């Protein structure tokens, strides 16, 4: 295996994980919902936050720039909310898009924090 191929191999693996995360998000958010009672804890917002944090982190580990990831995933989150308007028992919520955005920032922040820790450990 060439040195370049060795460097890119982990990124391909993370790209596969990111694609899997994306497919799970699309399936989970665009499948028709079921009526359910109001919840006292906002599990839905936590799910949005977690899913987009993981997607942002894995796409960053796959080698995409934060400057590409942030607007792309933000558009994805807003687009999903728009599509949910026409899906039975789904609805668009501004707070869902906000949870997506905060999750994206958290995922990118985790990547940045990890890189800083590695650099500091080399001092």
Where are these regions (language model features)?
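Membrane-helix interface segments
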Residues: 12-13, 62-70, 93-94
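Residue-level signature of the transmembrane alpha-helical core
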Residues: 54, 70-78, 97, 101, ...
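Short helix-capping/hinge motifs at transmembrane helix termini and TM-loop junctions
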Residues: 31-32, 64, 88-89, 115
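Aromatic-anchored segments of alpha-helical transmembrane domains
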Residues: 23-32, 75-85
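Interfacial helix-loop-helix junctions of multi-pass membrane proteins
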Residues: 34-45, 82-98, 102
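"…centered on the first transmembrane helix and the immediately adjacent amphipathic helix/loop
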Residues: 1-59
């Amino acid at each position: 295996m060439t040195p370049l191929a060795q460097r890119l191999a982990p990124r391909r693996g993370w790209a596969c994980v990111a694609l899997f995360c994306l497919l799970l998000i699309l399936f989970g958010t665009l499948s028709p919902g079921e009526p359910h009672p109001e919840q006292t804890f906002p599990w839905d917002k936590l799910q949005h936050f977690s899913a987009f944090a993981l997607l942002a982190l894995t796409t960053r580990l796959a080698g995409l720039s934060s400057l590409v990831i942030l607007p792309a995933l933000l558009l994805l989150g807003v687009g999903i909310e728009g599509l949910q308007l026409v899906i039975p028992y789904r609805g668009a919520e501004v707070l869902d898009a906000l949870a997506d955005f905060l999750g994206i920032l958290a995922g990118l922040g985790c990547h940045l924090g990890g890189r800083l820790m590695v650099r500091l450990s080399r001092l």
